């Protein structure tokens, strides 16, 4: 049975990447797979917050769009929001139950976190461009074209 903390003293440098002992103390000083720690550090270096970006110009630009441009812009936001809603939780749900490498576990959690930032960035755009972002959010799951396109990737 999977546990969130294994009390055994385990040498994870001798464990397989998947299907080994459940993880215990998160150690980031000794690695069997150092590439995952390097990837994790690289991802952390790209940290940003969507709110740091002013969208005042974008709001004005959107107001000047023709109807077909607004449709393309909004459809893209719907599509990206749907995909990153999956990607923001997918890697952890799919892989963490089977991971036995602390460095890979950390890399997957960071990956999920950054996908969530992407998703939050689409919310930030919608809150700044549309008078009522709910009008966009509430139509994502009713948009047959967006759903059809997303099924290719989900």
Predicted features, each with a name:
Residues 1-56, 63-65, 69, 100-106:
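Extreme N-terminal leader/anchor segments
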Residues 35-38, 43, 61, 72, ...:
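Exposed alpha-helical structural elements
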Residues 38-41, 45-46, 75, 79, ...:
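Charged/polar, solvent-exposed surface patches and flexible loops
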Residues 54-110, 114:
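Long, hydrophobic/aromatic-enriched structural stretches that serve as scaffold segments
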Residues 109-141:
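Carboxylate/His-rich catalytic cores and anion/metal-binding grooves
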Residues 140-150:
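Long, K/E/R/D-enriched contiguous segments that form extended
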Residues 152-154:
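Conserved small/polar residues in nucleotide/adenosyl-binding loops
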């Amino acid at each position: 049975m999977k546990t969130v903390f294994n009390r055994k003293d385990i040498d994870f440098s001798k464990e397989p990447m998947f299907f080994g002992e459940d993880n215990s103390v998160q150690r980031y000083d000794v690695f069997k797979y150092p590439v995952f720690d390097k990837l994790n550090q690289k991802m952390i270096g790209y940290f940003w917050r969507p709110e740091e970006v002013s969208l005042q110009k974008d709001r004005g630009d959107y107001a000047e769009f023709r109807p077909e441009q607004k449709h393309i812009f909004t459809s893209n936001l719907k599509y990206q929001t749907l995909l990153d809603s999956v990607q923001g939780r997918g890697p952890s749900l799919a892989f963490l139950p089977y991971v036995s490498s602390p460095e890979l576990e950390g890399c997957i959690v960071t990956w999920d976190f950054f996908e969530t930032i992407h998703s939050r960035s689409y919310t930030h755009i919608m809150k700044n461009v549309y008078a009522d972002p709910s009008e966009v959010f509430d139509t994502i799951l009713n948009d047959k074209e967006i759903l059809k396109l997303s099924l290719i990737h989900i």
